[in-house]
Amino acid sequence: MRPLAEYSSTFDLAPETSVPALYEGPIAWAASRRYLDDLALAIAKSGSNLHFMGLGGDELFDYMPGTVRSLWLESAPRALGIIRHLQTSRRIKGRTLLRAALRGDSYQQTLERVSLAMQQRTKADASDRYSWVPPMEIPHWFSDEGRALVIEKFSTIAAHPPAPLGNDPLAQQTIESITFQGGVLRQLSEVYAASGIDWQAPLTDIEVLRAVLRSRASARFHPDNDKPLLAAAVGSAAPHDFYHKRRRGDFTTDVHVEHGKRRRALFDELSESALADLGIVDHAAMRAAVYEPSSTDLGLFDAEHIVTAERWLRSVEQITGRN
């Protein structure tokens, strides 16, 4: 099979024709759809009906934003060393991480504070990025109607929040992320049901999750290895240098290249927009965000989310004949 980047449909508005896929709403893995289509065919042709995936590896064994509080409770001196490492390797202000480590807010208190910042359009405290939930930053290309809708929904949840999934931010985020990946696994089974393939992701197994949650937060960090906890569990089953730290992959570079090739056509294709017709986005601002996203990866994610939602709405309209 060709490299994943050559299949990408990140900025492609070609309609989705699979009814099971449309039932799932705008799927998070839409950009990999063409690759997965070919992968399913290749697996079926090989005579196999079982495919293992690595879903959950990053969530279980890598750094999560809520890690700093757990590190501090485990060992303050060790936490300071890891905070210093994160400050230099991820370019995060040390004072921000330290405030997050010392902050003892409950899940509900965090939701209430984030909700208030959204309502007042004030900038959330930077340390909230490393607490229970990240600050909700409504994109500038949302319309007033769309903004009000998001604030209303979030405020309702903040006023009567469900119980957190975990006892601390790290457990909450780990369980939440694994739950999301489990949802992706279910979607694959639904969308590719006709292939007869049993899609499996062993790292999303409940016993694996429980084992990781029982481990120390510091076990996720090592000066030389990525995912040291997983490396220790795998032991000699993997080559000795398999988990050595490597430079950042080229996935983001691929997305930038794809956007550069598609942005002019995409801008034109969005001259009419199902999202804009719903009134939840500012049409001109949305097109500008797609054509000229911010220079950060987040800007590209914004553009990707716009395309994913727009593609889904157009596909639903095409299949149902409704506007």
Where would I find each of the regions flagged by the language model?
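ATP-dependent adenylate-handling active sites, centered on carboxylate activation for C-N bond formation
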Residues: 1-149, 190-237, 312-323
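Short coil/turn segments at secondary-structure boundaries
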Residues: 190, 194-196, 224-227, 244-249, ...
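Long, Lys/Arg- and hydrophobic-enriched amphipathic alpha-helices
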Residues: 22-36, 169, 193, 283-289, ...
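Structural motif
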Residues: 163-176, 223-225, 289-306, 316-317
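PAPS-dependent sulfotransferase catalytic core
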Residues: 65, 238-297
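Secondary-structure capping and boundary motifs in well-ordered enzyme cores
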Residues: 177-180, 200-204, 258, 299
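Glycine/proline-rich, flexible active-site/cofactor-binding loop segments
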Residues: 132-173
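Short, hydrophobic/amphipathic alpha-helical patches that form generic packing surfaces
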Residues: 38, 175-186, 190, 301-318
